[in-house]
């Protein structure tokens, strides 16, 4: 084996030479890379996770602030605005807001309805909102400038009293009609009471805040929330317009010259629900621009209102159509993108006259890319913190990495680093993952599916092996730093883990030498177990395995331990029982070139091997003679340098010396 070939194909560069002892380095590395410091986290229940997702949209603490997990507020009689129970109270009030919005307009248009049961219901509803006013003085709030949760009683009360919300809350909660009846003994039937009741529409802001929060809550479907919001807006607008239309007709001086009086002459004496039905019917017909003609504006007041009503309907209809179009189109964007990508592939293959096999592979890969879009971790995890991404990778791929032969016996810290940097990919059937003779940039661990190891024989191909989940592909080219010796092709839909060459090399070289030795030991054991067909495809593999066995043999037989400097060399061997043996010797491993002939400057030149053999210098002269006999095919008795000087001590030799053994 030539010098260049041995240097390029030797896996020994992965063995790190340290200036300090392996024991000290291992201890320091273990301390620095303790898995407990990396993976230690507090487990959260599903309830905790739900609380986090609900709080995150409304509570944004400033940097450097700390909020306790159990009770962020240590002050008594304080209700946290993001507390789950307070959220339920707000939801209950939203239901009452819906009634208030309907009743205030209904009582304005139909005065007779405000005297009956609705008056009692209004009092009950106002009572709950009065309780909420008192409760607001004890509810924390989020400071918009510091983003801190304020729990001070004085600050909460001062902020609420100085706000417009306090004045409007009190005004919309006062039961003015009931107070008037209590004082005067007469039921207030004037229009003033109806308009004062419209102050209750101020409560609609609670509905807007609820939808704003639900749209950002991951527990609810965004499409459904937006549709419900549009439906509520439409129903409220129909109810508002219908009540105003009836109020205009009811208070017009000539009842028969109104839109409803022309159809029902005595509509004022008829049932309230009859008038409400007519009002809703005409409001819906006008909103939808159907216009049957059975109901129409008669007097100038109704015509004026209808003009503004239809103008507003144009904007409302445009808003609803725009929102619905956006929601529907958003769901079809992925399909449109896939169709566009497929059309681009078809045009490209047709223009460049690519064969059908390549076209089918490109189409299959593109379709698989869109089908597995939700499973590809890069797009899902790219915006997450590194710690969360690492935890997800540990959960998904830790077990499969531990089963791979190359990483068996790996320390915890190195496994954490490796799993944190891997990437998962999907490949459709009959897709080449690795091409023969390509540059070894990555190697793969098969998670699911299966692949074939293929060697090209001219125009034909030969399947050398079939690999399943847990197997590795492409690692031979990466470790030896040679062009990939085989083609790797999927048999069916396969998920693989891709590990980059440079990242793997940097990670191993930055760790202690014990980890590198473990990789080499596992790798050499795997190479010895390859079938003969695979070994034939790697010409230098047999010589490399023989050299490794010879080095182990020399290390076992060596009794000398020369000291040269502070560096330490560790030799690893794996016994048949699976145990790994480590032997240490001081000094940098020296590589020398041996020749089976006398030095060329002497008269008695032999016709031996002029190219020489590159070997690692053993520990003694006797072992050097034994190794030379095995490599050169003949045993010598003398060792000389190129200048003819005889070698008597092994320590006198230097790196890349030419030794002539004869």
UniProtKB/Swiss-Prot annotation:
It is a multi-pass membrane protein. The segment S4 is probably the voltage-sensor and is characterized by a series of positively charged amino acids. The pore-forming region H5 is enclosed by the transmembrane segments S5 and S6 in the Shaker-type (1P/6TM) and contains the GYGD signature motif which seems to be involved in potassium selectivity. The KHA domain (rich in hydrophobic and acidic residues) present in the C-terminal part is likely to be important for tetramerization. It is found in: Membrane. One of its GO terms (biological process) is potassium ion transmembrane transport. Belongs to the potassium channel family. Plant (TC 1.A.1.4) subfamily. Expressed predominantly in root hairs and root endodermis and, at a lower level, in leaf nodes, trichomes, and hydathodes. This is Potassium channel KAT3. It comes from Arabidopsis thaliana. Probable modulatory (alpha) subunit of inward-rectifying potassium channels. Could mediate potassium uptake from the soil solution by plant roots in association with AKT1. The potassium channel is probably composed of a homo- or heterotetrameric complex of pore-forming subunits. May interact with AKT1 and AKT2. Interacts with SLAC1.
